[in-house]
Structures are given as structure tokens and as C-alpha cells.
Amino acid sequence: ARQFGFEGVREFKLALAQDLGRTSSVHRAVSLEDDCAVVIQKILGSTAASLTALQHQLNPNTLNEAADLLAQATRIDCYSVGTTSAFMADDLQGRLFRLGKAAHAIHDAHKQLISAASLGIHGVAVAISHVGRMPFLLESVTFARQQGAKVIAITQPHTPLADMADVEIDVMVPPDAVMRVGTEAYIAH
């Protein structure tokens, strides 16, 4: 932070937040000059393109392998990092509940470690992270594996999280201009 001319990290974070607050972009392709019809076309068009690309990326055998692990598990804990991944973990928990599975969405790093300590060989940790590099999530996944649990990662390929997983569900979408995880990432996950 000091190398950028700030007194400390606090001042740097404040300046960054103020700068991002001035940015009116809600999507990488949308500009202030766009009318409503153009905004709709840009956002829905790029989302549709991302989903079409995802359709070609997903491996049905990988999804079957993940489904088998989930079906056999006595407990499924969904770990997430950040707002977008938290929404996805909550959604997955709800869907698993409807299938009669014992599932929990856990967003807090310390609670993830506690969960990982008790998952055991009949448990599955589903780790959801678009970037796949958050240290505390990687620590929880490592600990869950040490306890004998299986790990399903929903993340970008070639990330530390993907490399640690028993089953890796790769999700690649273009980055958003403002948010590191944008609309397409949320929908694709």
C-alpha cells in the first residue's frame, strides 16, 4: 500500500472502495451510453454464450462421478468463499435437502475447519470457489481429505483447489470488469 502512495492498508482499501463506487459498470460489456434494449442484449447474450461454452466444457462422466459421491455420502458440507459462491452453496444445500441428503452450506473459514474435522470417510466436501486459490478454503479441503472425506471442487481448471479434488467440475467463464466473479460465473456454477 505504501508503494502506491498510501499511509497504510486501511487508506488503500478506502481509496479502492471509493474508486469502485464511482464505477457505474455492472457488467463488463455495458456502458453508460447503452439504452435498456442494448443492456438486455449484452447481458443476456454474454450469459447465453457462457452457458453454451460451459455445455461443451462439462464432462458427463465427471458429473456422474460427482453424483455418485453425493448419493453415497451420509453428510455433505458445501464450503464457499465470497458472496457469489455463498449463494451457490446455499442453493446446493437446498437442492440436496430436497433429495433427502444431510447437507450444510458453510461460509465461515473456522466452521469449515470444524466441519472438515468431522466429515470422515462417508462425508463429502463440495468446495465452491471461482478463483480456486483462497488459502483458508484450501486448508479446509486438505483437512477434510486427511479425515478420509471425498472432495468435489466446482472451480476453474488448473487451480490449487482443482488439483486437490477427487472430482473436479471445471467452470470457465470470462472475468467481469468490476467484480472478480460476475453474472456468468454465478449462473454457470
Spans of model-derived segments:
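HTH-adjacent hinge/linker in prokaryotic transcriptional regulators
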Residues: 1-62
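Short, flexible segments with low predicted structural confidence
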Residues: 41-42, 67, 115-116
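Glycine-rich phosphate/diphosphate-binding loops that line cofactor/substrate pockets in enzymes
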Residues: 61-75
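Short acidic-hydrophobic sequence patches enriched in Asp/Glu that either
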Residues: 8, 187-188
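Glycine-rich phosphate-binding loops that contact phosphosugars or nucleotide phosphates
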Residues: 71-187
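A structural signal for well-ordered alpha-helical scaffolds and beta->alpha junctions
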Residues: 44, 188-189
